UniProtKB/Swiss-Prot annotation:
Catalytic reactions of this protein: tRNA(Pro) + L-proline + ATP = L-prolyl-tRNA(Pro) + AMP + diphosphate
Domain comment quoted from the record: Consists of three domains: the N-terminal catalytic domain, the editing domain and the C-terminal anticodon-binding domain.
GO molecular function: aminoacyl-tRNA deacylase activity; ATP binding; catalytic activity, acting on a protein; proline-tRNA ligase activity; transferase activity
Name of the protein: Proline--tRNA ligase
Major place of residence: cytoplasm
Taxonomic source organism: Streptococcus pyogenes serotype M5 (strain Manfredo)
UniProt family annotation: Belongs to the class-II aminoacyl-tRNA synthetase family. ProS type 1 subfamily.
Position of the signal peptide: none
Summary of the function given for this chain in its UniProt record: Catalyzes the attachment of proline to tRNA(Pro) in a two-step reaction: proline is first activated by ATP to form Pro-AMP and then transferred to the acceptor end of tRNA(Pro). As ProRS can inadvertently accommodate and process non-cognate amino acids such as alanine and cysteine, to avoid such errors it has two additional distinct editing activities against alanine. One activity is designated as 'pretransfer' editing and involves the tRNA(Pro)-independent hydrolysis of activated Ala-AMP.
């Protein structure tokens, strides 16, 4: 493919509005362009990478018997009313009307559509299991699109749905998908973890997320590639090395999710779902009587603890939420933070929002900073973190502005439902008892759910079982964020390329080091001087030879300065660069391996053989 015939609008500078390196490089290297807020055009390079990823998916899904189809993106609202999600999905749902004033949506996901198709066609357990998937654009009206392809209003997704006559059959397919996802992300060159995830708006029960890890850019050996002009990091002057470190640190870590994982076991979970080892304690201290104390100007836990000279772990944090229009009091040990996902899941609520101060005052009779669980109205629902039940003689708000109560004892002074609703902390014991929890940032690239009968129940999707009884179809759901794969790969494979000029100056610039499986082309074939007939002839021969051996070749035939060509090559990030330069008449070319910066000169006759050796090594 001739580079002069492709739309690859590279930029000389990083885009000023980019906050993460993947967004900056996709724009600068000419992979994507923003059409409007949260909506992107995938230019030829990005489209080729996405198509290669689709090929990987199709190959792995064929192995597990998944069949591809295509459903419409424009959906009637009636389907979503059947499932109940039209009212509960929230403001992210694109809603529109046609000329007949009928309600439609742009699909963010397709559970309802696939359920309807199977409901209308499948009547017996003998027709199951079915394993269907599609790859298409989805739509979500993000309030604040950001970080390039990571948070957009239109995005490409693979969504699959499986249909079963029992849960045992679902378990088999779920495990097939888990293994297929691991194979897909491994082939894509991603560093990832499969973690315990939240079903969220999908309504899933068991679920697993696949997170591409986005580590801090502190390891120079990983993030910096030295040109052959620099022997090692030790040769770089200290002041230049500090500049390089600052440049690496300047780009924020893009992972939108925090992962908690064990240092010594396979346990890993999204922070929203992570838990820790919990051991109830036996109360040995005598219970004090309740005492009301004045705490003027104390609005926060740390202010109250300091004023009363107690540790924050001896205080009770009282929060008020509105869950599906009903008030719920949530209690935590004072130095803990609420995990609203855990609370929402426990309550099985569609909506969960923090109460306003006006709502809190109406419920407790006091404002924020003085709320507590003692002497609440009969029938008040109190959900307390399990650690709260270990407290003895704690401090809590008195439900009276400027006052708190000491000597508060769970069980005696209030009744509650005890469940894990806190956010775990680094260094706590893993829930399996092996190792401690550490945190990492990650980008969600895949998610699998056991939906069960959530949609078949609400939409009447039933089959006749072995005994002739009508039973709901059991479902699974399996998603991959196809377009955000591009961002995840670049986040992990961006590199800072450093070289030394003949004058002794050090220069560095960001570029991409694409893994072979996803690179838009395998080889970047560069002609230094397109006016040199010997170079042109050799380039044409090499291009034909490489393509005959199955290499995808991008040939830079542009009449540009060699410096611009090399800069664009570093930006675009193909695994191999072959340069036809001054020694073209002698049949000598240069091979450069992008991942390491290593380069060698070889006879053009030996190019294919040499590449086969080098690609095996790297």
């Amino acid at each position: 493919m001739k580079q002069s015939k492709l739309l690859i609008p590279t930029l000389r500078e990083m885009p000023s509005d980019a906050q993460v390196i993947s967004h900056a490089l996709m724009v600068r290297a000419g992979y994507v362009r923003q059409v409007s807020a949260g909506i992107y055009a995938y230019l030829p390079l990005a489209n080729r990478t996405i198509e290669k990823f689709k090929t990987i998916m199709r190959e792995e899904f064929e192995k597990i018997g998944a069949v591809e189809m295509l459903a419409p993106a424009l959906l009637t609202a009636d389907l979503w009313r059947e499932s109940g999600r039209y009212e509960t999905y929230g403001e992210d749902l694109y809603k529109l009307k046609n000329r007949d004033n009928s309600d439609f949506i742009l699909g963010p996901t397709h559970e309802e559509t696939f359920t309807t198709l199977v409901r209308d066609a499948v009547k017996s357990y003998k027709q199951l299991p079915l394993n269907l998937y599609q790859i298409q654009s989805k739509y979500r009206d993000e309030k604040r699109p950001r970080n390039g392809l990571l948070r957009t209003r239109e995005f490409i997704m693979k969504d699959g749905y499986s249909f079963h006559h029992n849960y045992e059959d679902l378990d088999v397919t779920y495990e097939d998908y888990r293994q297929a996802y691991e194979a897909i992300f491994t082939r894509a060159g991603l560093d990832f973890k499969g973690i315990i995830g939240d079903g969220g708006a999908m309504g899933g029960k068991d679920s697993q997320e696949f997170m591409a890890i986005t580590p801090a850019r502190t390891d120079l050996d990983r993030w910096v590639v030295l040109d052959k002009s620099i022997a090692s990091m030790d040769d770089i002057p200290k002041e230049v090395l500090e500049e390089i470190k600052a440049e690496l640190a300047a780009w924020m870590i893009s992972g939108e999710d925090t992962i908690a994982y064990s240092t010594e076991s396979s346990y890993a979970a999204n922070l929203e779902m992570a838990t820790n080892e919990y051991k109830p304690s036996s109360k040995v201290a005598a219970e004090d009587a309740l005492a009301e104390v004045e705490t003027p100007h104390c609005k926060t836990i740390d202010e109250v603890a300091a004023f009363l000279s107690v540790d924050e772990t001896q205080t009770i944090k009282t929060l008020l939420f509105v869950a599906d229009n009903e008030p719920v009091v949530a209690l935590l040990v004072g130095n803990d933070h609420i995990n609203t996902v855990k609370l929402k899941n426990y309550l099985a609520a569609d909506f969960l929002e923090p109460a306003s101060e006006e709502e809190a005052r109406a419920f407790f009779g006091a404002g924020f900073g003085s709320l507590g669980p003692v002497n609440l109205a009969q029938g008040s629902r109190i959900v307390a973190d399990r650690k709260v039940q270990n407290l003895t003689n704690a401090v809590a708000g008195a439900n009276k502005d400027g006052f708190h109560v000491t000597g508060v004892n769970p069980g005696r002074d209030f009744q509650a439902e005890y469940v894990d609703i806190r956010e775990v902390k680094e260094g706590e014991m893993s829930p399996d008892g092996h190792g401690v929890l550490q945190f990492a940032r990650g980008i969600e690239v895949g998610h699998i759910f056991k939906l069960g009968t959530r949609y078949s129940d609400s939409m009447g999707a039933k089959i006749l079982d072995e005994n002739g009884r009508a039973v709901p179809i059991v479902m699974g759901c399996y998603g991959i964020g196809v377009s955000r794969i591009l961002s995840a790969v670049i986040e992990q494979h961006a590199r800072l390329f450093v070289n030394k000029t003949p004058k002794g100056d050090y220069r560095y610039a960001w570029g991409i080091n694409f893994p072979k499986e996803l690179a838009p082309f395998d080889v970047h074939l560069i002609t230094v001087n397109v006016k040199d007939q010997a170079a042109q002839d050799l380039t044409a021969k090499l291009e034909a030879d490489l393509m005959a051996k199955g290499y995808d070749v991008l040939t830079d035939d542009r009449n540009e300065r060699v410096g611009s060509k090399f800069s664009d090559s570093d930006l675009i990030g193909l695994p191999i660069r072959v340069t036809v330069g001054k020694k073209a008449a002698e049949g000598i070319v240069e091979i450069k391996i992008k991942a390491t910066g290593d380069s060698i000169e070889v006879n053009a006759e030996n190019l294919i053989e040499t590449l086969e050796i080098l690609t095996k090594e790297h």
